[in-house]
Amino acid sequence: MSGGWQRRVSIAMALISEPRILFLDEPTLGLDVLARHTLWEGIRSLKGKVTIVLTTHYMEEAEALSDRIAILKNGRLLGVGTPEELKEKAGTDRFEEAFVFAVKEGTI
């Protein structure tokens, strides 16, 4: 079974018990573009039904899938907000630049 299918099966198994919160740790790590796209669609389909806590090192993934984002460094919370709020606070229109700003400045 491919990595993409393994992740989909794992998420499906977790959803069987109808959790209120779903924790996804780096869910697209190592996936190809098509598998990632399919998984993103699945995650988006859960919005409004399940609270999802997702960890990722991919800024485009955080921005595309998140209503609110917490930026952490070494276990310390640097900032939290919507992607738009974080970009505005950093004075940029790119989320990756907002992330870099937060990490370099130690806050956002």
Predicted regions and their residues:
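Broad hydrophobic/π-residue packing in well-ordered secondary structure
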Residues: 1, 26, 90, 99-100
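ABC-family P-loop ATPase nucleotide-binding domain
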Residues: 106-108
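A generic structural signal for secondary-structure junctions
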Residues: 70, 91, 95, 103-104
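Short C-terminal domain-edge/linker segments immediately following a structured domain
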Residues: 52, 84-85, 101-102
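ABC transporter nucleotide-binding domains
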Residues: 1-73, 77-79
